[in-house]
Amino acid sequence: VMGGGFGLACVSDVAIAGPTAKFGMPETSLGVIPAQIAPFVVERIGLTQARRLALLGLRIDANEACRLGIVHQTAASDDELEELLASALDRVRHCAPVATAETKALLHRVGHEPMSGLLDSAAEKFAEAIRGSEGTEGTMAFMQKRKPAWAGESD
């Protein structure tokens, strides 16, 4: 997972690495700069680690990538990778689509807006969600001890 792929891992919501995955920013060893991905790498792992990887053109294994926060989980085998992926996708299906999108949008606003305005906006979004169709369905499903409609019948 080099260059642009490394950048994609840094902007992903959930990243799972296989047992043989290698990550790196080889651009400087190729005579170019990691212009498009550098801001995302810094945001994901911090300036000092991004400098170390980029300025030395380092390649790291999946465990180091997990330690740095580039990926969230590592698999010891290809079979475990498939299991972790299936589990993550199953968890996604258990979450309401609109609530998930609104949550992601809220999280991306943190650090870019004043906290007071962000909290006010979040409270408004929460109230809308409670009154909305997903909030109603989720509450009813919980009370009736069943899966919400968006979760499907596959499990």
Report each predicted region and the residues it spans.
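Glycine-rich beta-to-alpha active-site loop
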Residues: 1-30, 59-62
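Conserved catalytic core of Hanks-type protein kinase domains
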Residues: 44, 56, 129
